[in-house]
Regions:
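Active-site metal-binding core of divalent-cation-utilizing nuclease and nuclease-like domains
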Residues: 1-18, 22-74, 136-137, 143
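Catalytic cores of nucleic-acid endonucleases
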Residues: 57, 70-73, 79-129
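Charged, structured surface patches that assemble and position nucleic-acid processing machinery
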Residues: 123-140, 144
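Residue-identity detector for threonine
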Residues: 37, 43, 49, 83-85, ...
């Protein structure tokens, strides 16, 4: 089976993450001046500190924080068709769950059922799924 190069996939994902951040998390804004959006692709900007097996920082694709204080408000992970997998749910989505902020996982249109199954198998509860579809000039997001 043909699989695109990792560099190509990563380049596309960086653009999709940027488009999702601009469209769905345009903070700070007049309506929400106390929020700040940090995009961690291609370079980590703001981490989420988690405990468990030692304190460590995780870098979701998008992290929205309340300012001042940088308290997590929304944790967002954006996936490509290659990364909607059981391993991704276990190794990436599950650790991003926090009691402090909801976890949003954006998956390509057509991959929602698989993503839900993987999240359930990984014991992830309360995840909020969205689908994305590339369109000329940006990304269209659908909420579920």
């Amino acid at each position: 089976m043909w699989r695109r190069a990792e560099e190509s996939r990563r380049h596309e994902l960086v653009g999709i993450v940027r488009d999702v951040a601009e469209a769905r998390f345009p903070y700070p804004s007049v309506a929400a001046p106390h929020y700040r959006t940090h995009v961690n692709l291609p370079t980590p900007e703001m981490g989420l500190t988690v405990a468990g097996g030692g304190v460590r920082a995780l870098y979701p694709d998008i992290l929205v924080v309340q300012y001042p204080g940088n308290h997590p408000a929304m944790v967002v992970q954006v996936e490509s068709k290659e990364t909607v997998t059981r391993e991704q749910a276990e190794r990436v989505w599950a650790p991003l769950q926090t009691a402090d902020a909801p976890l949003y996982v954006y998956v390509p249109a057509g991959h929602l059922a698989s993503a839900r199954d993987y999240a359930r198998a990984a014991g992830i509860k309360g995840v909020r799924f969205r689908t994305w579809r590339r369109q000329p000039g940006g990304v269209i997001v659908q909420e579920f």
